[in-house]
């Protein structure tokens, strides 16, 4: 069975100005194992594994656009921004590129093959939130999600939710649906009956531009926050109880935003949307 249905968040990587330093931070924070891809053409691309299963990666960031600086121009010390990118599964990156253009998005990187592992492209939605798509080859995507030590959830952080309600169904096939929670009006994105992503109003964290945010599942939110600070990270929002679970919003030492969350039992977590 295919793990990731088209439109589901399938892969997650960090663009960083200093791959080695970023690898040290995240392995120290989450207990991941970092492995540098041996192919010379990979440019030092480094994968992260949790208990032997791929969860994410880090690469040297070589794209610098306003879309890749959601926390503003001063969120790095090395001349290039740091940002987590969410890759959504697709059966056809080229056809999806045409849909993005038709729906009012922007093509940041046209489709390209990646070492036989798959085919990718990078876009921005009409509000300016950057995201990528992944057509699987040898690599399908993350081997585990939704459990501590892996990506637990992703969210569209935006001030353009009206446009998003039109754009993402037309491109990724994501259907917006109400959460059913009192006082929460931002939609959850579904593939069929499966929730695969959420939405957050821009301004809740220090971000100044729309973006796709990555939430990592952890056993202990407060302890993880303390460890992040010890390793050189900083806190955007202190741990607090939310409908999804206890959560905090952080910046890594190079300014990449991410969140950590103790997933509440029975609440939707990251999933492939496969059937």
Swiss-Prot record:
Boundaries of every VOC domain copy: 8-136, 150-263
CDD domains, per database record: SgaA_N_like (cd07247)
Native organism taxonomy: Bacteria, Bacillati, Actinomycetota, Actinomycetes, Kitasatosporales
Pathway annotation from the record: Antibiotic biosynthesis; daunorubicin biosynthesis; Antibiotic biosynthesis; carminomycin biosynthesis
InterPro entries associated with the record: Anthracycline_SecMetBiosynth, Glyas_Bleomycin-R_OHBP_Dase, Glyas_Fos-R_dOase_dom, VOC
Organism annotation: Streptomyces peucetius
Lineage top rank: taxon: Bacteria
Gene responsible for this protein: dnrV
Keywords associated with the record: Antibiotic biosynthesis, Repeat
Protein name: Anthracycline biosynthesis protein DnrV
């Amino acid at each position: 069975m295919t793990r990731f249905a088209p439109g589901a968040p399938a892969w997650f990587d960090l663009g960083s100005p200093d791959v080695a330093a970023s690898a040290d931070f995240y392995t120290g924070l989450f207990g991941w194992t970092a492995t540098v891809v041996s192919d010379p053409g990979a440019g030092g691309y480094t994968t992260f594994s949790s208990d032997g299963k791929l969860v994410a990666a880090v690469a040297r960031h070589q794209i610098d656009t306003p879309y890749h600086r959601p926390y503003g121009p001063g969120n790095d010390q090395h001349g290039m921004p740091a940002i987590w990118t969410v890759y959504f599964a697709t059966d056809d990156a080229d056809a999806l590129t045409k849909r993005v253009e038709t729906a009012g998005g922007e093509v940041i990187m046209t489709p390209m093959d990646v070492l036989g592992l798959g085919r990718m492209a990078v876009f921005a939605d009409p509000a300016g939130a950057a995201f990528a798509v992944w057509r699987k080859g040898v690599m399908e995507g993350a081997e585990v999600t939704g459990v501590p030590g892996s990506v637990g959830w992703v969210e569209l952080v935006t001030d353009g939710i009206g446009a998003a309600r039109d754009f993402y169904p037309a491109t990724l096939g994501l259907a917006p649906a109400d959460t059913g929670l009192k006082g929460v009006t931002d939609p959850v994105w579904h593939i069929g009956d499966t929730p695969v992503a959420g939405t957050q109003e821009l301004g809740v964290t220090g971000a100044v531009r729309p973006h796709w945010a990555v939430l990592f599942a952890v056993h202990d939110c407060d302890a993880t926050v303390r460890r992040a600070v010890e390793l050189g990270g900083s806190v955007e929002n202190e741990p607090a109880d939310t409908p999804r679970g206890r959560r905090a919003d952080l910046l890594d030492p190079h300014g990449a935003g991410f969140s950590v969350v103790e997933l509440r039992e029975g609440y939707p977590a990251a999933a492939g949307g496969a059937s």
